Amino acid sequence: LGDTPERIPEVLQRYQALRRVDVLRLQNAAWNAMEWFENVGERYADQLPPEQFMYSMLTRSQRISHENLRLRDKAWLEGFERWFAESAGLQLPAHVPAPPPMFTPYTVRGVTLKNRVVVSPMAQYSCVDGLPGDYHLVHLGARAMGGAGLVVAEMTCPTPDARITPGCPGLWNEAQRDAWMRIVDHVHAHSDARIAMQLGHAGPKGSTNAPWDATGADHPLPEGNWPLIAASALPYLEDGAIPRAMTRD
């Protein structure tokens, strides 16, 4: 390509285009490793168990995954998995392979999850007057029966004016309490998953359309709006309602 001086700029430009992404990946891996040594390595070197510290160090660049380690040193990783499983409370016979760390129990403040798979909150915008119904029972129940250790229900609002949209769930009256209890009882009866709730407040994003509304997601409702309160008197979008800034009173 560079057989004449006039083509040198073109060659350099093509070389940069081909190599730029790979160079960025290497730089990012180096940056991650540097931050690990500056933070994890310095703060926890004398606190973490040797096995955990070594695993953290080997994966510090975020370019070497759990299964990558198996390709590099299968015996070491199997020993680490057994140590991790026993640290999580599993008693495994010598002939039984240890499960991957994701599928070991995890205990938080006296609550033990059967594994470390967590279903994150997923906003559904499908309530009427904040009341979860059959849709939510099926949605959350299916995730619980799918094998996750913990299922977290979508953002639930403690007051009507804390909602993002009219379809957001709430927990400000007894009817909603009973509806949530029905879902919790269903999860407990048909799975060994734990279920939790994400409590939240819309802030400046409140009183807006559902994502699929023809007038545009996150834009103010055409009617039936409610007053907003937020950390500051700034709208969520330029054409959004201006919330009242919170005070200590």
Label the predicted regions.
Residues 16, 27, 144-145, 240:
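Alpha-helix boundary recognition
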Residues 86-202, 208-209:
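N-terminal capping/small domains of soluble enzymes
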Residues 2-90:
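C-terminal helical "tail/cap" subdomain of flavin- and related membrane-associated enzymes
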Residues 42, 169-171, 213-216:
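Short, hinge-like loop/turn segments at secondary-structure boundaries
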Residues 5, 133, 170, 177, ...:
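Active-site oxyanion-binding pockets that recognize sulfate/phosphate
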Residues 200-249:
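Non-globular sequence segments
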Residues 24, 36, 180, 223-226:
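Tryptophan-centered motif/residue detector
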